[in-house]
Amino acid sequence: VKSVSIAGVAKSFGGLSVLSGVDLEVPSGSFTAILGSSGSGKTTLLRIIAGFERPDAGVVRLGQRLVDDAEHQFVPCERRRIGYVPQEGALFPHLSVGRNVAFGLARQDRRGTRVGELLELVGLAGLARRYPHQLSGGQQQRVALARALAPDPEIVLLDEPFSSLDASLRASVRADVHGVLRLAGATSILVTHDQDEALSMADQVAILRGGVIAQINTPSSLYSLPRDAELAQFLGEANLVEGTVSGKTVQTALGDLAMAAGPAPSAGPVRVMVRPEQLILGDAATPGVSSVVRSYEYFGHDAVVRVLPENGGLPELVVRITGGAPLVPGTRVGVSVHGAVMVWPTGDREPRPGAWESERERITHA
């Protein structure tokens, strides 16, 4: 199984820069998600790894093998031992499931047991004679995965393979696919615009912003320790409040809060991130910031409560809770903070309305 190494990769279309000096290391046998908005360049990066596109600059290595240096060395896609799962699955409608899976195999392999083994691996044993139109969307994606795994690739690339599935199917299918890839032992790279998908599936997540890797880390570290406020809001709901650093704590209208590990200003004004699940609600007599419930949304596994602090120094806060009776708008509650918070210097990459969506307009080819 091969690692993937990308160094200084750049790509432009018609004079418009799509990727600019991208560096990425994907360890052997790991699962990496490249997360970004539509038009951020993530699919272009995946196509360069696959060999469908050539970079304008930079190098791509699969293991120790140089497969593209943007000038002289180039190994075509069919010689890279890569499996590719496109967005729509792209099954051949006139071929049965078994023949779709066997499409990339040498003739002698077609007569063997490989197809049956793969269909069993993806949970579709016994469906070899069916046709794509007889399958659900989730089953079609699993056939596409089986086809990608058929030649025993060392690397599997997935280009937003779950985006066309119904929300009710998406979580279960991605869990199935993740399990299959783990069993196969292949190095896997997923590109997606779905934060939940990236955080739940990957060993490491690389966030692509404006054609460069803005941050790469484990899912939990990215979510808890984003590099700036803009990334914090891209990765999930975030309450951003003003504060002042004093020693090892930050003074805010929510109280004096412990700061998370990592680089932080030693003094002065900062932006403070409090995730919704860090906020705790109590009754009006509970110590904390006195607030009024504005709305309550129930989602089954949890609920989202929006509260407006009464002291005037705080914006509306988003709180995520589990259990308890529904909260009626107008109810007075006390709000407190649990755990350490992330801080950044004021003005350091502030969130911009529509910042991530604007990437879609900036780039139309990626």
Briefly describe each language-model feature range.
Residues A50:
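Helix-to-loop junction immediately C-terminal to a conserved catalytic motif
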